Amino acid sequence: IELPSQQSLSLLAPDKKKESILRPMQLISGRIEENSTELVKYRHAPKFAPAGQSTQMIIGATRETDLQILRLSERLYQKYRLKRVFYSAYLPVAESPLLPALTTKPPLLREHRLYQADWLLRYYGFTSDELLDEKHPSFHPLVDPKCGWALNHPELFPVEVNRAPYETLLRVPGIGVKSACRIVTARRQGRLDYGALKKLGVVLKRAQYFITCSGKLADGL
């Protein structure tokens, strides 16, 4: 895809059209779906595109917001079943009135925040419109997207780790997919305390502000 919007394509690559980029994605997505049906019927049918399909977006060459970029990624995952969207910070290599100045630094931190948000879309059950909105269309450079979401929703915290469902645990800063699974499994054997959470892989220096164990906050809070 390279550029996140038709406006950017028209500005920097007028010979390219959005439809000419998306049509092959649609064809590949359809063929992958057909192939999955074939594999059910015929065990030895050859696999089509076993690694799936991916695309890349250039970040910082044009003026799209993080929200616009993330919404596009979300649609690509949903509609074309992409395996991965890659984000690449724009590195100025040529002088042009249409592009950032050669002295512009690549937006590497912004790239990193988009990768973090992309992970939340794919594995944590978030949507783009939960993470950003029209009033706040870009991520804070000093706060990761998951923590930013939690800070904006104090009414949802603290979460009691001994009772919260898996989907709720995933939204707690400092709790990842693996540690959420471990919590759900471990608490069947007994109530968990902060020491147990640390052993299960929870990053307590972040999670402690958003959780309770048996109704208790972490020491010092």
For the regions a protein language model found, what residue spans apply to each?
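Short Lys/Arg-enriched helix C-cap and helix-to-coil transition segments
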Residues: 195-199, 208
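Long, highly charged, low-complexity intrinsically disordered interaction regions
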Residues: 100-170, 204-221
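Short, basic-rich loop-to-helix N-cap that marks the start of a DNA-contacting helix
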Residues: 190-194
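Conserved AdoMet/S-adenosylmethionine-binding subsite of the radical SAM
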Residues: 1-125
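Residue-level signature of tetratricopeptide-repeat
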Residues: 186-187
